């Protein structure tokens, strides 16, 4: 069963994630009668056996991760950690687990429930949490009467997918560079992989995914062309011939010389291999805030305050 659900090279698991991800991004992907009766097939049905809480992409992924582009308050936030440290990665895994089970996202939506949109996301995700934690295991146990079957088919994939997404996100958002105004540079904090080993529907172009999400996966090269000047200027995070899982591990274990030699694409053609390694290592260690300070920020209601400040600025 492990070979069946994970697949060789994790491709079945990756495909299940990819299709659920695409459904979350495309609320009109199915006809109205399908949306009202079955909903998102991979996100809300198949996903129960792949560690995915129903509605997690529709709610948390869209209204936290993409709204904040990985910034403070995101359930996937990681810029309070040293991405070149495997020890810091161990602090990140529980954060992803809290996201996967729905707890952290529910708490974030609840704290911002004054917004009708966020209140709607709270109750939608709450429905998904109840389905995943009560309905799904109840049905499986009712049919099989086997706790072992329940562990292997339902709980184990949750643990595996948690680690998988932690590694993937560790790679996708590993690097931080600030421009002359102190703002994060988009072509650095979300990376692009060219000729990737496991690309599915343009998932490897995470830069386009965040900063031009309307771009269809066959057209991401057009967005790359638009970003070329910035990529050259800031030595953007562009890599080649590597999977995001492999890259995540290479970053985690501080293998920047190997990344520089084999995978980094220097569009400026001005940097030596060692300069690239030093630059990437430095960017992987840049923090927006210290880990303990970020926890204090969360406890003090930083998310709600930031949302109010952003709304006031917009008005």
At which residue positions do the language-model features occur?
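Non-catalytic, topology-defining segments of multipass membrane proteins
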Residues: 1-151, 218-219, 224-315
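Intrinsically disordered, low-complexity segments enriched in polar/charged residues with Gly/Pro
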Residues: 2-4, 154-155, 192-193, 199
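Transmembrane alpha-helical segments that form the membrane-embedded catalytic/substrate-channel core
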Residues: 8-25, 53-57, 154-182, 202
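A generic helix-loop boundary/linker signal
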Residues: 51, 55, 157, 196-197, ...
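Extended, compositionally biased low-complexity polar/Lys-Gly-rich tracts
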Residues: 65, 151-153, 188, 193-194
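Short, conserved, surface-exposed binding loops centered on an aromatic residue
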Residues: 138-144, 156-160, 196
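Cytosolic/matrix-facing juxtamembrane and C-terminal tails of multi-pass cellular membrane proteins
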Residues: 170-215, 220-223
């Amino acid at each position: 069963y492990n070979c069946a659900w994970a697949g060789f090279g994790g491709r079945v698991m990756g495909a299940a994630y990819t299709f659920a991800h695409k459904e979350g991004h495309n609320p009109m992907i199915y006809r109205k009668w399908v949306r009202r009766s079955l909903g998102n097939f991979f996100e809300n049905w198949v996903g129960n056996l792949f560690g995915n809480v129903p509605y997690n992409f529709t709610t948390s992924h869209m209204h936290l991760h993409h709204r904040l582009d990985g910034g403070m308050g995101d359930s996937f936030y990681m810029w309070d950690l040293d991405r070149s440290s495997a020890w810091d990665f161990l602090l990140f895994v529980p954060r992803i687990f809290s996201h996967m089970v729905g707890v952290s996202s529910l708490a974030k939506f609840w704290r911002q429930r004054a917004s009708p949109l966020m209140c709607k996301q709270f109750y939608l995700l709450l429905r998904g949490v109840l389905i995943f934690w009560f309905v799904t295991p109840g049905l499986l146990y009712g049919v099989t009467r086997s706790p072992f079957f329940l562990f292997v088919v339902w709980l184990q994939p949750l643990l595996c997918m948690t680690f998988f997404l932690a590694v993937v996100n560790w790679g996708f958002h590993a690097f931080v560079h600030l421009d002359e105004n102190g703002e994060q540079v988009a072509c650095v904090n979300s990376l692009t992989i060219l000729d990737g080993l496991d690309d599915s529907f343009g998932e490897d172009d995470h830069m386009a995914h965040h900063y031009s999400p309307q771009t269809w996966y066959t057209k991401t090269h057009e967005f790359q062309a638009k970003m070329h000047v910035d990529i050259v200027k800031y030595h953007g995070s562009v890599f080649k011939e590597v999977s995001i899982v492999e890259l995540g591990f290479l970053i985690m274990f501080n293998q920047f010389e190997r990344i520089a030699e084999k995978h980094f694409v220097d569009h400026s053609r001005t940097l030596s291999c060692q300069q690239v390694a030093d630059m990437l290592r430095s960017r992987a260690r840049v923090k927006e805030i210290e880990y303990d300070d970020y926890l204090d920020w969360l406890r003090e209601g930083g998310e709600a305050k930031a949302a109010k400040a952003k709304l006031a600025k917009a008005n």
